Amino acid sequence: VRARAGMFLSFQTPEEIPGITLENFLRTAQNAITGKPVKVFAFRKELAQQMEALGMDPAYADRYLNVGFSGGEKKKSEILQLLMLKPKLALLDETDSGLDVDAVKTVAQGVKAYHNETNALIIITHNAKILEGLKVDYVHVLDDAHIVRTGGDELVNEIIEEGFHAVKEDEAK
């Protein structure tokens, strides 16, 4: 229902789904969203291109969804889903958690490839690095369930340079 409405949710800890390959999951989801069967050749071509852009081994398309994937592979799998399903609204819950520096860059590139004027993106993160290079409209810094600071690109840069702690301290002054 949410997917048909154009919504996508990325989980902090993606579930493993044995018995359904990544390719079959994505093709079935696209069929459900569009209401018509996707053309297999075109689908596989786009899937291969998106997987290559994310540095994913093409063999992952034939593996069960997230089963035996490392943490980084699960996050890339979710970004692949984002790119293939093209939702109108995406909520990414700590999609960068537990990733090494290179994987954060790859995930950030995937997020950047998705984001444009026709969709909305909400990113929950403890690491502002994933926001680098994205054109953000708003940044809200939360502390103890309260918004302590709001800004735009300038706030992203401030957080990257000084950290969340410094940004929260500035607000307390």
Language-model features: locations:
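ABC ATPase NBD coupling module
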Residues: 1-8, 114, 159
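Conserved beta-strand-loop-alpha-helix hinge in the C-terminal portion
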Residues: 2, 133, 138, 142, ...
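ABC-family P-loop ATPase nucleotide-binding domains
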Residues: 15-88
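Hydrophobic residue in the Walker B motif beta-strand
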Residues: 90-92
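Walker B catalytic motif
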Residues: 94-95, 102
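Conserved D-loop-proximal element of ABC-family nucleotide-binding domains
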Residues: 100-105, 150
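Helical segment within the ABC ATPase nucleotide-binding domain
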Residues: 104-117
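H-loop/switch region of ABC-family ATPase nucleotide-binding domains
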Residues: 125-127
